[in-house]
């Protein structure tokens, strides 16, 4: 079952987000995930995207299972980004899809009553369209600030779009993503939560970063 409290601090990552380290990127992901879970992130979203990501479906599934196992160990929701069929196969807690992925109606048909669904929006129109879809658990809004983590990131929408969606009567929980750091997270406190990538993966002291993000979120 979906609990909106899990949106407070969602860690989003895949092996590609450890391009800056020497050594095995998959192990770096697993080590960082366990540290983040120990530090009380409220959800984890597994996201393999881009040229540096794993390309072999067998390897992707193996890594997803390892991440899921860690999330179960700490009782934290495990969400898969975009890969709807993998999310269903692994019985993930949720799936998060974007505007260019599988049609949201098809995602709902496949996933309803099996796992919760998050949907990315980057315009007010997209949010208004999604508000009547009962099976969408939450909306991910962004990028709020400039982000180094996504090569395909849309134009920065700013905190202003979050406010517009919130004020327009959309009652679904809103989670902010894109360029969020320990310094700017406090600007987003009135919303349901934040999702971060590099704020954790590139932090020198990852446990401290999670602590600060939780305090400011």
Curated annotation (Swiss-Prot):
Pathway the protein acts in: Cofactor biosynthesis; thiamine diphosphate biosynthesis; thiamine phosphate from 4-amino-2-methyl-5-diphosphomethylpyrimidine and 4-methyl-5-(2-phosphoethyl)-thiazole: step 1/1
Any GO MF annotation of the entry: thiamine-phosphate diphosphorylase activity
Enzyme class: transferase
One GO CC annotation: cytoplasm
Binding locations of 4-amino-2-methyl-5-(diphosphooxymethyl)pyrimidine: 45-49, 81, 120, 150
Binding site for Mg(2+): 82, 101
NCBIfam families for the chain: thiE
Protein known as: Thiamine-phosphate synthase
Upper classification of the organism: Bacteria, Pseudomonadati, Campylobacterota, Epsilonproteobacteria, Campylobacterales
Gene behind the chain: thiE
């Amino acid at each position: 079952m979906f609990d909106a409290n899990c949106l407070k601090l969602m860690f989003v990552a895949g092996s590609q987000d450890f391009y800056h380290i020497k050594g095995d990127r998959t192990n770096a992901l697993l080590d960082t995930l366990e540290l983040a879970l120990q530090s009380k992130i409220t959800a984890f979203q597994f996201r393999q995207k881009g040229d540096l990501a794993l390309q072999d479906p067998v390897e992707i599934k193996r890594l997803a299972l390892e991440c899921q196992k860690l999330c179960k160990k700490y009782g934290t929701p495990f969400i898969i980004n975009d890969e709807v069929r993998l999310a269903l196969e692994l019985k993930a807690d949720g799936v998060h899809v974007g505007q260019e992925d599988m049609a949201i109606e098809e995602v709902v048909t496949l996933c309803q009553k099996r796992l919760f669904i998050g949907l990315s929006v980057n315009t007010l129109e997209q949010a208004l369209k999604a508000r009547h879809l009962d099976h969408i658990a939450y909306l991910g809004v962004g990028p709020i600030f400039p982000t180094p983590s996504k090569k395909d990131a849309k134009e920065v929408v700013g905190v202003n779009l979050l406010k517009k969606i919130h004020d327009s009567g959309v009652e679904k929980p809103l989670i902010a993503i894109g360029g969020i750091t320990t310094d700017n997270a406090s600007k987003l406190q009135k919303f349901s939560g934040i999702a971060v990538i590099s704020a954790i993966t590139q932090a020198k002291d990852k446990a401290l970063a999670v602590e600060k993000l939780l305090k400011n979120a």
